[in-house]
From Swiss-Prot:
Entry keyword annotation includes Nucleotide-binding: no
Designated name of the protein: FMRFamide-like neuropeptide YLRF-amide
Major location category of this protein: secreted
Modified residues (Phenylalanine amide): 4
Keyword terms: Amidation, Neuropeptide, Secreted
Protein family (similarity comment): Belongs to the FARP (FMRFamide related peptide) family.
Top-rank lineage group of the source organism: Eukaryota
Location in or out of the cell: Secreted
Alphabetical GO biological process terms: neuropeptide signaling pathway
Annotated GO CC locations: extracellular region
């Protein structure tokens, strides 16, 4: 994922 992009943040997590």
């Amino acid at each position: 994922y992009l943040r997590f």
